[in-house]
């Protein structure tokens, strides 16, 4: 089915006081994400993927080792990734982490802070463009992972609970080359933990 650019669930300037400027959201959502939607729709038109869901397109077109040559996958996966990214952020100080999520993270990582440290390290350590993730694996275990370019947990049968874009366009306007600072700010000020917990 045709991709549709989702509206942001908040105003473009709603995150500005928390470290993500109106300019960043205008470029990132209105231009970058829109380009993935527009290009994806052009590429799937008249193909077997035209009437498939974005999730089916991502899993059906993923080819390990050949992502750079796969335009349909790249645009579909980046559309899916960004739709999640907008959903798990919110205005106001990052909402209090629900007890169930706090408990799950503490049991898995030792503490919520250790999870945040591991997540930030994964994002900072991703060479080049990519994403940092908190995922629920097929066996129900929580893990921190990172992926290159537009690859996402759907490719591996995993459930994405939290994703952070570490492509340079996501942070250069506000943080320049300071990716670690961007990741820390994301975790401490931008994440809507209630939205993350709802994906458990």
Name the predicted role of every residue range.
Residues 1-200:
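Feature for soluble, non-membrane regions of globular proteins
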């Amino acid at each position: 089915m045709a991709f549709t650019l989702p509206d942001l669930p908040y105003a473009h300037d709603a995150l500005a006081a928390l470290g993500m400027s109106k300019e960043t959201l205008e470029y990132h959502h209105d231009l970058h994400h829109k380009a993935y939607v527009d290009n994806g729709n052009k590429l799937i038109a008249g193909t077997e993927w035209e009437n498939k869901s974005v999730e089916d397109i991502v899993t059906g077109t993923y080819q390990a080792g050949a992502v750079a040559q796969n335009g349909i996958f790249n645009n579909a996966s980046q559309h899916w990734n960004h739709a999640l990214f907008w959903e798990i952020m919110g205005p106001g100080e990052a909402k209090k982490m629900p007890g169930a999520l706090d408990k799950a993270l503490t049991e898995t990582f030792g503490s919520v802070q250790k999870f945040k440290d591991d997540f930030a390290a994964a994002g900072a350590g991703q060479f080049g463009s990519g994403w940092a993730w908190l995922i629920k694996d097929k066996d129900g275990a929580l893990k921190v992972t990172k992926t290159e370019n537009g690859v996402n947990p759907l490719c591996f049968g995993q459930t994405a609970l939290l994703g952070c874009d570490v492509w340079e366009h996501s942070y250069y306007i506000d943080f320049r080359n300071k990716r670690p600072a961007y990741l820390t700010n994301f975790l401490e000020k931008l994440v809507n933990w209630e939205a993350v917990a709802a994906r458990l």
